[in-house]
Every structure is written in C-alpha cells, then in structure tokens.
Amino acid sequence: MIGEKKKRIGLIFGGYSNEHEVSISSAKTVFQAFNSEINKKRFKVKSFYIDKYGDWLDNDLSEKILNDEIKSNNIKKQEIVNQQKINFLDGIEFQNIDVWFPLLHGLNGEDGSIHGLLQYTRKPIVGCGILGSAIGMDKIMMKTIFSNLKIPQVNYLAFQNEDLDDREVKKKVINEILKKLNFPFFVKPSNSGSSLGISKVINESEILQSLEKAQKIDSRILVEEGLEVREIECGIIGNSELLTSEIGEIKYESDWYDYDSKYYSNNKIIIPAEIDSKITKEIKKIAIQSCRALNIFGFARVDFFLEKSSNKILLNEINTIPGFTTNSMFPMLWKASGLNIEQLVAKLVDISLDL
C-alpha cells in the first residue's frame, strides 16, 4: 500500500555451530529474496552476523558477507574491533527491528536458544518458539514423543555419555546394539543437523569408532536401524492452521544422505514425489500431527522414510529451521506448491505477525 511503512527485518545468521557455513548460505538466499523488486517495497533488512566465537557483528560487516564482498573466514580480528561488536543486552542495535528472522542452523540457534533471547525484545519471530525448537533439535526426545503417539519409526536405541564411560560399559552397549538392531545401522549425535557426526555402520568393528565420533558432538547418542527406504520430505507453514507443501523425494548418488550429499552433490529432486495419492495424504496428515505434538509452528520441514519393500511410512525427524540454500528442499517444495522464494519469505513474516 502507498505510504505504508516498511517492515524492518532482523536477519540473524552464522552462529557458534558446526553448521555455521550452511547458515550463511541460507541467509544469502533469504537476503536476496527480501531485496527483490517486489519485496523491497515492503521490507528493509538489517543483518546480524554471529561469528564462530559467538560475537555479534553489526549490519555493515554482516551485509558484506551476504553480498560476497568478504568471506566470513577472512574477517580479521582488527576488522571486528573497528566495526565494534554488538552487545545484545545494550539494545541499541535492536530497537528498530519489527520482525526477527533467525537462520541459525544447529546448536546455539535452532535448539531454541536464539528464540529465548529474542523474546526479550518483545518482537515477532519467524519460526516456532523455544519448546518446539528444543524438542525438534533433540532427536532422542523427539522420537520418544513420536513413540508415545504410536507414530511408526525405524527401530532405535538411545544412550548417554555415562553409558560409554569405560571399556566394560562400552562392551555392554555394543552387545545391546548387536542384540536389538540389524546391520546396517546409523549412529548419530542426538543434537546435531545436516548429518554432521553421523556414521553408517556395516559391521561390528566400526561400532566403537562411530560412537566416539558422535560423542565429540553431543553427550546423547542415537542408534537407528538402517532400512532400504526412499527419502520423502514435506514442508509446513502456518500457526493455528498448518499448511502442507507438495511432497518431495530426494534421490542421491552416495551410499546414504550424508553432509556432502546434502550440500555438494547433484542429487535428483522429484516434486511431487511419485507415490500413491493415499500415501501422500497420510504423509501430510502425519506431518501436521507431529508438528502439533511438538508445538512446532511458523515453518518446518518434516522428513520421512518410505520403506521400499512395503511402502510403509516411517517418520524420521522435523527440522525447525530447514535450509534455505539454493540446493535446499524446503524452498523447492514451496515453489512447487505455488510460492516462489520471494513470496515464501514474505509469507513467513506475515505468519509471524499473525501470532
């Protein structure tokens, strides 16, 4: 509308996380979408880059990263001093924000910590709240809730660091895994994303190394049985009413859908997925049911397995801040559903304002 004041968007990216670089890539896509011809009439973006040490940097340096004028790993300490780090608690840099758009993937962001901090500003936040974010980040807690709801999943076991304290205890854990799960299986940190820290285990000799690898990232470890499956994904947006996107399938060239496959491989994306209409309907139903159960709203991506031998639907996990990179499934799903990236980011802001 003529004369309507532009909404000031606080775009937060980077972060003290193993998924730092993915966050930057996502933020670049969203930044460009907000600065498109159609959106720059409605929105003005102020960027906040959080470096790998957790320091907040001001808009000028943040925009240079988003515009590829400088690489995040080339920022010198002197530049940070000259630009002056931002103290969030001072509030000076944050007073003129109307809506927050956090794009921090992984720990110290997607786990609800950034949402809790931003609530102190009393401004709307794109995405879900603290509870849904925290549960969505913790695979073990998430799967426990899904189990209580009787939603089908792959067989799994969960362990704590104290379960792996010494050699004898580790032997008991390995024996339990061998007794209850069939090869292959996947060992995962409970709190991690983008397949970081995950190992595919095909024989007994690999178990201990995979457990120790996961321990380096998190103190809680998930072990899931591997099946012959198709990777199916569904996008969710909304608040009181959750909308589902088209269903998509990812076909990858590697042995499994690891970090490199997600971000550096030429995967085949099929949207809509070539599956039966009844299965599509059931996947969408479970996607909404699972988000409601975890108090997830705003936007999310719900990941499923479809067992090849039986077409059985298995819920995998929910990502509360899915990737927005050029290779990311979430924006592709919504583009196929009638919302291009420019429309999508605007829609997500509108959803946050409706809360």
UniProtKB/Swiss-Prot annotation:
Binding residues annotated for Mg(2+) 2, in chain numbering: 317, 319
- One of this protein's Pfam families, by short name? Dala_Dala_lig_N
Q: List the disulfide bonds.
A: none
Taxonomy, superkingdom: Bacteria
The Gene Ontology biological process annotation of the record reads: cell wall organization; peptidoglycan biosynthetic process; regulation of cell shape
Q: Where is the signal peptide?
A: none
Q: What's noted on cofactor binding?
A: Binds 2 magnesium or manganese ions per subunit.
The UniProt annotation places ATP binding at: 178-233
NCBIfam families on file:
D_ala_D_alaTIGR, PRK01966.1-4
Q: What does this protein do?
A: Cell wall formation.
Annotated HAMAP family: Dala_Dala_lig
Descriptive protein name: D-alanine--D-alanine ligase
> Which species is listed as the source?
Prochlorococcus marinus (strain MIT 9215)
- This protein's encoding gene: ddl
